[in-house]
Regions:
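Solvent-exposed edge beta-strands and adjacent loop segments
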Residues: 2-88, 141-157
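Generic N-terminal initiation segments characterized by hydrophobic and/or small/turn-forming residues
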Residues: 11, 32-33, 113, 117, ...
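Intrinsic disorder/low-structure terminal segments
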Residues: 19, 47-48, 73-75, 107, ...
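Compositionally biased, intrinsically disordered linkers/stalks adjacent to structured regions
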Residues: 29, 35-36, 164-177
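Structured, beta-strand-rich domain cores
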Residues: 65-127
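Short intrinsically disordered coil segments
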Residues: 101-108, 158-160, 175-177
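Short beta-strand and beta-hairpin "edge-sheet" elements
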Residues: 120-169
Length: 177
């Protein structure tokens, strides 16, 4: 008999890095570290609020048709719907062009396409390096709206914006140079 295996836990807290890179030379099946740390990429790990949507999926379960003699019915895995949803990020309506306070707002012009790239399991402040693994989500940015984020005295001005997942994700792909 094979003994059960219990993998070690991987902490999530402060180990969730998100980078946006516009459509262009980036390849989700051969992700380039140089592109992800380059001038066209934007690390949004500390711009997106915790309330932002994360990529998700929902898979339908279809039931087999019952036959006259069946006492049971069974399920099939059906269609899967993938989405990202509404992200919320910091914004200063009085911010100077190209400043940190408006970088996400300027980068995510409605209609912009690119990839949200996620690295998990390593401190978010640690730089990306060759050999680390990332998951890439192709996406398109929807319209932007100024909204409050938080409550009462602690509220901040934010932008809420829908991101659509436009293709299949690439999970756990090693970063290349």
């Amino acid at each position: 008999m094979v003994a059960p295996v219990r993998p070690n836990s991987t902490k999530m807290y402060l180990r969730d890095k998100w980078i946006f890179i516009p459509t262009g030379t980036y390849s989700p099946t051969a992700p380039s570290t140089a592109l992800l740390i380059g001038a066209t990429a934007l690390d949004v790990s500390k711009m997106f609020f915790q309330s932002s949507a994360r990529p998700s999926q929902s898979t339908n379960l279809a039931k087999s048709p019952k036959r006259i003699g069946d006492g049971e019915t069974y399920e099939f895995v059906g269609e899967t719907s993938v989405s990202i949803g509404e992200v919320r990020y910091s914004f200063n309506p009085q911010g100077v062009a190209l400043s940190n306070e408006v970088k996400a707002y300027e980068k995510f012009v409605p209609g912009t396409t690119g990839f949200l790239v996620n690295r998990l399991g390593i401190d978010r402040d640690t730089d990306l390096t060759t050999g680390q693994f990332v998951t890439s989500y192709p996406c398109e940015c929807g319209p932007q709206l100024e909204v409050p984020e938080g409550d009462a005295e602690g509220a901040e001005i934010a932008i809420v914006q829908t991101f659509a997942q436009t293709g299949p994700k690439s999970i756990k792909v090693a970063l290349l140079a």
